[in-house]
From Swiss-Prot:
Family per record: Belongs to the acyl carrier protein (ACP) family.
Cellular location(s): Cytoplasm
Entry keyword set: Cytoplasm, Fatty acid biosynthesis, Fatty acid metabolism, Lipid biosynthesis, Lipid metabolism, Phosphopantetheine, Phosphoprotein
Protein name: Acyl carrier protein
Top-level taxon in the UniProt lineage: Bacteria
Natural source organism: Anabaena variabilis
Residues of the Carrier domain: 4-77
Length: 77
């Protein structure tokens, strides 16, 4: 799967999980906490949704570093 395909799938999950009203705010640089108003529970649930969608397991240590949309894409690829 290409980087752009992964980004589009991650973007879709982020929009659903965080109830993002304006999809244009979900950019690679968008911070879950600062730009998308996600709290720590939202982030945990988001990582779980990504693990399920991509059929992967993200170790806790790596999950803590997923703070932006691009970081999520990088962890998956």
């Amino acid at each position: 799967m290409s980087q752009s395909e992964t980004f589009e799938k991650v973007k879709k999950i982020v929009i659903e999980q965080l109830s993002v009203e304006n999809p244009d705010t979900v950019t690679p640089e968008a911070s879950f906490a600062n730009d998308l108003q996600a709290d720590s529970l939202d982030t945990v649930e988001l990582v779980m949704a990504l693990e399920e969608e991509f059929d992967i397991e993200i170790p806790d240590e790596a999950a803590e570093k997923i703070t932006t949309v691009q970081a999520a894409v990088d962890x998956i690829n």
